[in-house]
């Protein structure tokens, strides 16, 4: 049999099982196989001996595959076609390694032999290249052709300037659609080609203009990656054609100035003015501002009868931090438009290669993308791969060939494209835009390009990448390359490109002259922010008629008769209902629910997410009830009335950074909604520290971007160790300045009721940081009367002593915040001469209110600040100066003394016994002889 194999190229080892199965059929019934095979097998001697030696004893064919592939009429031609189809599949999987992706030509590409993409790997040889094959329905535009023609077409599609990775996609429909689009040739009309060249000219000339006028000034040029701006422009135009009404863009600093002008539509003179006088906001706003390449902008793009609103988000230099923020903004806009198909508003994110594979928030954000609570219908990602991360080479920043491996965790299609081939870039963009709109999923286009200068224009790249930059120095620009192509094809003449550049240079010169006297505009408090104030007004009345609260609370306790809830919850709702109807004091969870309920009935949408937020980490909220019989759910807060607003509550994925960023972004686009993020424990909030530092605390003074986001951080020292005790209150207080946010540590249900409602009823929007309770959720003293939530009531930032004590007999005044109050209260003896005052709001510090209370007790000899946290943590370092200033205002010649835990590197001890001893010690020191022994 061997001699026949040697003579027949289509019989190779990979077909052993196939041939053996045919041979078995032949032995059983010679007429069951094709005549060609009958003749072949008839020449074989010693049939039984050959069969006994076959590998079929070891390797058994899949009967389903065998049945599908081996029909009675399979011939040489059929096998030949099968091999061709296998080659197509292999090209689709692996030919991206052969693609010409590097415009600098530095990459050493693999060969067909290495990748087993040569025809011999499929049991074919050069003698068969002119033979006809039939691959109907397998390869677009090719049905009956020669094998050589198929190889040529495969090489053109898969090994030219685009390399694709679609194998991670499980959905067959999506995968086939992508291959069809890729294998379909697209052409550009002459006018389109000239328009593309004009885009190149505007991108290139603006960068060169700034380089000449402001030498050495940082601008993070996009030169070398010019095609990314052209591609983004194309993506927007394509989106307009698909009915998209708004696009939110997020990106880092490289190429931002060109994106602001060329893409979003900011006047060139506005950007140039920032270079001339350094001002990027009107002086009268009196804000700190930010550098030019961090700023955002919004404008409408109008074309014929179409209009689309474009927004470029402000962001810091913390790469990729903007990703989930943009997603949150898009989701909020979609929700406001009731865009359930998520097709009217979309996001475009631009990433750097080193950042995309290096920053963990990328994986967090991508993982969120398909989840119901965070789905925005897919994001279009452009990865601008300039093959460097500051001074680090690609090999220093990742182990993989591509920077886009993270995208595979959500099975996103990835198209890699050579940035010097603009028509290939635009084809990839066209596929990506249509895919996102059709399948509502993320898609990635990686543009491999280069960076003309160093990390910034003052940096010298020759120190570290001399070989690369020697190539770049002599390299024509992408625009120049394309212009030469158009000249060769006769679309433009030799002078066309130069004339375009000269014409645009004249425009920029005019913009430069106008920039000298240009007055910056703020574009502040427009759109959905109309009616919101920048400054605090009179304190909002946040109370609600008691009867209304009782009715709402009772309604929340009504469960449908055919809905079976857990018996423990039955009891909980019975107790809660009885508490409300009999006018007894309510707990924290009830107060929160009542605050939500009245806001919803007043037309305010509410969104709350976080790890375990549906039930609540401490099993107190139970926003979503689960039927014990089946998997159905019931949300009481969405069943108050037919005209109420929407309550959305969701458990987040196990991430802080991206999730908090998403909710912050959501709050930026929905100032009339109450948006909350809750940490599982406050200790874990520092996983999102960048969002707190770069956005929540500082966005108003840097970018004039306000947020009303509420952050709930469970915080208290209860013997649970260093990872479940502290939300790092001190860090938030360190960030507090210019009345940038509210920082609170409330102790009563009434306080949280008013705080939540204040976020909406005030005319201003500021983030609210809440050190929320754990054990106080069920503490017998941590309750409030409904009258404290009633009409004409409001949030009280400082709570006076609750017991009747003769102020003339007071010897000591203790100020504190949070849970420690109840520890002090429980340990203080009856008829004590010590008063305990609570600061429900730590920032802004209400000095006048505190001073008025201190003056009331001006005969006291000792003034103490008591806290549970170590001395170097908690509020002490922030509040000591403020408290002493309040004493001065009260005309009391004294100072506050610290009582609390000693300084510590760790927030809390791991031993419950040690914790209890520490707690007892600080209580004894605070109360002295007035402590219950």
Curated annotation (Swiss-Prot):
Cofactor(s) annotated in UniProt: thiamine diphosphate
Q: Which gene encodes it?
A: sucA
- Purpose of the protein: E1 component of the 2-oxoglutarate dehydrogenase (OGDH) complex which catalyzes the decarboxylation of 2-oxoglutarate, the first step in the conversion of 2-oxoglutarate to succinyl-CoA and CO(2).
Family membership, please give it.
Answer: Belongs to the alpha-ketoglutarate dehydrogenase family.
SMART domains listed in its UniProt record? Transket_pyr
Could you cite one Gene Ontology molecular function of this protein? Answer: thiamine pyrophosphate binding
Asked whether the UniProt record includes DNA-binding among its keywords, one would answer: no
Name the chain's protein: 2-oxoglutarate dehydrogenase E1 component
Recorded E.C. number(s)? 1.2.4.2
InterPro entries in alphabetical order: 2-oxogl_dehyd_N (IPR032106), 2oxoglutarate_DH_E1 (IPR011603), DH_E1 (IPR001017), KGD_C_sf (IPR042179), ODO-1/KGD_C (IPR031717), THDP-binding (IPR029061), Transketolase-like_Pyr-bd (IPR005475)
Top-rank EC class of the record's enzyme = oxidoreductase
Report which residue ranges the record marks as coiled coil.
Answer: none
Tell me the SUPFAM superfamilies matching this sequence.
Thiamin diphosphate-binding fold (THDP-binding)
- Give the originating organism: Rickettsia typhi (strain ATCC VR-144 / Wilmington)
Q: How does it assemble?
A: Homodimer. Part of the 2-oxoglutarate dehydrogenase (OGDH) complex composed of E1 (2-oxoglutarate dehydrogenase), E2 (dihydrolipoamide succinyltransferase) and E3 (dihydrolipoamide dehydrogenase); the complex contains multiple copies of the three enzymatic components (E1, E2 and E3).
UniProt-listed GO biological process terms: glycolytic process; tricarboxylic acid cycle
Query: What are the entry keywords?
Result: Glycolysis, Oxidoreductase, Thiamine pyrophosphate
